[in-house]
């Protein structure tokens, strides 16, 4: 460990591992350290022994749940958008050679006490039970505008300036009811809350197009998921880094960030060893004095022995409960997966519920999600702070990632990756097709 590196990375969360892989490919000498004995941090997938050690220390796991190795339990309910930024990064870096993906079978939204499939295009909107006949026509016209809008053709604008007109005013122009606005804004554009309504319409249109293009890629739903769990993602990028010379040290305590007299970080101490580097990346847990809390998340991991009710017995689903449907300020997300994803034994299913904490009783806030699951075999819940760095890292050369957030996908995470990459290198991350490993 007593060597000099270009970059030291602390923690093997997905943000850290993507950056480690990208910087290694760029020719940087990278040392990657994690205090845990497993990859992934908050993006990890744990076996049963690890799961019980984290949530119920000292308690033995039930033998009835089968072999440890048959379980890969995610800590967060996230899926990849099939046409999203993380998927593109995986393809361009050739990390897809290490990871096999399976499509999520259905995308649902909670409305008026029941769940229904989210329409992915104009034709599905016409068949949706979420809307009345006349509302379906209005929704179809709105989605046609989203799809047909062209910057170079004013005839497609429909008297809408997407950089000036708010999304609220656009919905009003098309005469869409509040319930329809809910599933478009929250189940298609995937917003956490209603702040987007007051903002210009461009971003919402782009988000709906991402949803639609992701569905168009494979059909059924816009989401894909790695076999053996989300923990495969950081491990895939760690392998990329290692192939390009990166050094990995798991189960390695980090005792101190070492700074020079000018306050700039120069290395990391573990015991009596010091590794030096020009730049340091890390998750918030390694920089407690340099981050602030911006909220809290409550999550529940539930083991079921049946599919989630009212989802056509599908092996995998996402369910979004829009805030207004349960008188909240933030949505509730449910990710459901099963043995076909190699994350649990046959006959079992996993459902993970998540939302942003709004009250003094966080567990009561996920109750609407729990009600949709039916009988639960085991459940594990916890509340976590959401952290973000207080500075951009350019002065002290400590580049800190944001906590894994409440969104149901990875688009915000890749925004953080791109932002940190630019601050560290001074250049935008440009995705160039990497040579295939066998070609090198």
Swiss-Prot record:
GO cellular component, one term: cytosol
Endpoints of the signal sequence: none
Keyword Transferase (UniProt): no
Pfam families: GDI
Keyword Transferase: no
GO molecular function: Rab GDP-dissociation inhibitor activity
Annotated GO biological process: intracellular protein transport; small GTPase-mediated signal transduction; vesicle-mediated transport
InterPro entries in alphabetical order: FAD/NAD-bd_sf (IPR036188), GDP_dissociation_inhibitor (IPR018203), RabGDI (IPR000806)
Gene3D superfamilies recorded: FAD/NAD(P)-binding domain (3.50.50.60), Guanine Nucleotide Dissociation Inhibitor, domain 1 (1.10.405.10), Guanine Nucleotide Dissociation Inhibitor, domain 2 (3.30.519.10)
Domain of life of the native organism: Eukaryota
Family assignment from sequence similarity: Belongs to the Rab GDI family.
Name of the featured protein: Probable secretory pathway GDP dissociation inhibitor 1
């Amino acid at each position: 460990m007593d060597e000099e590196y270009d970059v030291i990375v602390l923690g093997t969360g997905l943000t850290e591992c993507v950056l480690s892989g990208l910087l290694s490919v760029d020719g940087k000498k990278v040392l990657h350290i994690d205090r845990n004995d497993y990859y992934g941090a908050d993006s990890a997938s744990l076996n049963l022994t690890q799961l019980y050690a984290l949530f119920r220390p000292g308690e033995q796991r039930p033998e009835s749940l089968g072999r440890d190795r048959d379980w890969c339990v995610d800590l967060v309910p996230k899926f990849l958008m099939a046409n999203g930024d993380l998927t593109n990064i995986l393809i361009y870096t050739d990390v897809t050679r290490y990871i096999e993906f399976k499509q999520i079978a259905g995308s649902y939204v909670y409305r008026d006490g029941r769940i229904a499939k989210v329409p992915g295009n104009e034709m599905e909107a016409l068949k949706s039970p979420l809307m009345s006949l006349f509302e379906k026509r209005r929704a179809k016209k709105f989605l046609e505008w989203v799809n047909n809008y062209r910057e170079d053709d004013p005839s497609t604008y429909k008297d809408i300036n997407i950089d000036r007109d708010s999304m609220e005013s656009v919905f009003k122009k098309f005469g869409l009811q509040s319930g329809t606005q809910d599933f478009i804004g929250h189940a298609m554009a995937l917003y956490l809350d209603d702040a987007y309504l007051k903002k210009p319409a461009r971003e919402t249109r782009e988000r709906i197009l991402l949803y639609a293009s992701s569905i168009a890629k494979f059909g059924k739903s816009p989401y894909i998921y790695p076999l053996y769990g989300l923990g495969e993602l950081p491990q895939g990028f760690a392998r990329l880094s290692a192939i390009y010379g990166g050094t990995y040290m798991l189960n390695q305590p980090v005792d101190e960030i070492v700074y020079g007299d000018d306050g700039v970080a120069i290395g990391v101490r573990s015991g009596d060893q010091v590794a030096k580097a020009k730049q340091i990346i890390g998750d918030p847990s390694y920089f407690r004095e340099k981050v602030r809390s911006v909220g809290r998340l409550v999550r529940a991991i539930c083991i079921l022995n049946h599919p989630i009710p009212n989802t056509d017995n599908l092996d995998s689903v996402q369910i979004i409960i829009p805030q207004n449907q349960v008188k909240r300020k933030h949505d509730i997300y449910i990710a459901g997966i099963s043995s076909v994803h190699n994350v649990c034994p046959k006959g079992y299913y996993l459902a993970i519920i998540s939302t942003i904490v709004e009250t003094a009783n966080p567990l009561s806030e996920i109750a609407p999600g729990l009600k949709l699951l039916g009988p639960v075999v085991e459940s594990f819940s916890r509340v976590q702070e959401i952290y973000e760095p207080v500075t951009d890292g350019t002065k002290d050369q400590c580049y800190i990632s944001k906590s894994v957030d409440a969104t149901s996908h990875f688009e915000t995470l890749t925004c953080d990756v791109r932002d940190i990459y630019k601050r560290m290198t001074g250049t935008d991350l440009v995705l160039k097709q990497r040579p295939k490993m066998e070609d090198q």
